[in-house]
């Protein structure tokens, strides 16, 4: 982690009594609740953000993918063809009155701006049920007989509770698909869970590899032609519930091509660990037929809303560069309250922003780290130099409101040497006296997000109101926070990506105040920047 040091003068802000948009004294986030914190000082000055074009539809995220209406969930791994990325996600056009999902299609040239291309694989068309998660691939070797470079998709179909795998082919480069003859290519062997095929080409063995979710296990299969599949092995888990949406891929540790580790990733249930549903990952070895883990799983994202995640490489870069990092996207929602969220003209949450996933050595061990996509920088104003420095003794209120629409808040949180704080909190106004908290617990060395006081928390299930946190050691007494906020989401990247927390949130219209609190000591906010992000809503055809 690199601490950003400001060259500007610092602002020393002491607590004072004042009228503010939210009440800091209602917090109590630590295991040992602090005494009530006085209201923030109205005299402090924060960096002044410039104007930004808000999301064109009120209530819609400015940056995140949402469906045109009805219901969205699982993203499908994108592929690159003819200068465009092709992304699909599950979509139910009949929600809430009817069931079943199809594959909805979007395209992009930069993984930031997306164009709506409509439904690509329709549900209930081949007599085998609706369309669930799977994989789109480019068959460069013409293994399936549809021509070199044909776009094909393998996806789970479900009818009367029976899950099978079907093959679909596209004659127009992935915009529409037809069901292949002979479906299903993988009939159900008599098990309740048999779903979400993740397929990739194994060049070393000239065959396709599939990872398939099978209850508490991931099954591995190979095929020469995407039709005939041979079982190879199974990786079984304990205490993580029914697995969904697996992924298998290699990454180089610290960009070293001589130290390549395989990653097995899957949607899982962390309730037995005091967590919630999320994305679990194991590091280990893959020999072409079986995966062997080097240890216990880690959670790719410690927030409550990052599920059904998938990764992919950029085929335009070298093999060595493909091992350095991968793109990552997930579904920002949680089945424990997915249907309870407010649904103005669509439901199901959003897809996360595209991220970059890498392996870095942390405390002597390889660990997955997640960073925002570099392309997001193009949405921010030109760099205006170092940010502001603020000293917070108890509480502080920014005099300038947060930008309309999406924004990015970056800061290094440091403890004062003479009077080190136990905990630091950034409080983002959610309106009507409610707020969202992003903070760091220096005593427990954990970064956390709390939305138990956002605009809808009072009516939501307990799993929504639970405070989520991730372990993160400070670097020389400081922690970097990179926070991206959209109309219904907060994504926190801490410590250079060593900890990530993604949350669906809800605010009242016009809620733009914010401040900070320092518990049991003094906090220094270094190089504090608040940048508006230009709106990039899904472009309609």
List where the protein language model places each region:
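Beta-rich carbohydrate-recognition and catalytic domains
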Residues: 28, 33-197, 201-244, 252-302, ...
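Secretory targeting and sorting signals
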Residues: 2-43, 48
């Amino acid at each position: 982690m690199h601490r950003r040091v400001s060259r500007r003068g610092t602002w020393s802000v002491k607590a004072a009594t004042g009228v503010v948009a939210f009440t800091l004294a209602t917090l109590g986030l630590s295991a040992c609740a602090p005494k009530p914190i006085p209201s923030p000082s109205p005299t402090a000055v924060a960096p002044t953000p410039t104007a930004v074009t808000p999301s064109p539809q009120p209530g819609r995220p400015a940056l995140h993918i949402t469906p045109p209406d009805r219901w969205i969930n699982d993203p499908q791994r994108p592929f690159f063809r003819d200068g465009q990325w092709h992304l699909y996600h599950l979509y139910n056009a009949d929600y809430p009155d009817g069931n079943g999902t199809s594959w909805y299609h979007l395209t992009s040239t930069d993984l930031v701006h997306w164009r709506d291309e409509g439904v690509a694989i329709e549900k209930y068309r081949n007599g085998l049920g609706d369309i669930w998660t799977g994989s789109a691939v480019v068959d460069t070797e013409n293994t399936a007989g549809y021509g070199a470079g044909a776009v094909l998709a393998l996806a789970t179909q479900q009818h009367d509770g029976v899950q099978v795998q079907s093959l679909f082919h596209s004659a127009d480069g992935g915009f529409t698909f037809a069901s292949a003859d002979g479906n299903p290519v993988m009939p159900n062997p008599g098990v309740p869970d048999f779903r979400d095929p993740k397929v990739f080409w194994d060049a070393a063995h000239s065959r396709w590899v599939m990872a398939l979710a099978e209850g508490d296990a991931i099954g591995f299969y190979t095929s020469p032609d995407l039709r005939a599949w041979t079982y190879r092995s199974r990786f079984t888990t304990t205490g993580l519930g029914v697995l969904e949406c697996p992924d298998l891929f290699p990454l180089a540790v610290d960009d070293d091509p001589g130290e390549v580790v395989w990653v097995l990733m899957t949607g899982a249930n962390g309730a037995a660990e005091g967590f919630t549903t999320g994305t679990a990952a194991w590091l280990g070895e893959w020999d072409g037929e079986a995966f062997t883990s080097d240890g216990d799983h880690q959670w790719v994202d410690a927030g409550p809303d990052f599920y059904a995640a998938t990764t992919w490489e950029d085929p335009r870069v070298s093999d060595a560069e493909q091992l350095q990092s991968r793109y990552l996207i997930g579904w920002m929602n949680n089945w424990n309250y997915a249907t309870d969220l407010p649904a103005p003209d669509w439901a199901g949450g959003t897809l996360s922003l595209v991220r970059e996933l890498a392996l870095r050595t942390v405390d002597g061990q390889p660990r997955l780290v997640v960073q925002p996509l570099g392309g997001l920088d193009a949405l921010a104003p030109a760099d205006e130099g170092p940010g502001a420095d603020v000293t917070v003794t108890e509480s502080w209120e920014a005099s300038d409101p947060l930008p309309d629409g999406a924004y990015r808040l970056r800061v290094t949180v440091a403890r004062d040497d003479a009077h080190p704080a136990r905990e630091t909190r950034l409080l983002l106004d959610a309106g009507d006296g409610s707020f969202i908290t992003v903070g760091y617990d220096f005593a427990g060395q954990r970064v956390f997000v709390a939305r138990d006081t956002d605009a809808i928390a009072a009516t939501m299930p307990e799993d929504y109101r639970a405070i989520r946190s991730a372990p993160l050691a400070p670097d020389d007494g400081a922690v970097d926070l990179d926070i991206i906020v959209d109309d219904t989401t907060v994504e926190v990247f801490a410590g250079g990506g060593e900890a990530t927390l993604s949350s669906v949130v809800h605010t009242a219209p016009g809620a733009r105040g914010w401040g900070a609190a320092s518990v049991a000591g003094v906090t220094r906010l270094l190089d504090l920047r608040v940048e508006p992000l230009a709106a990039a809503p899904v472009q309609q055809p």
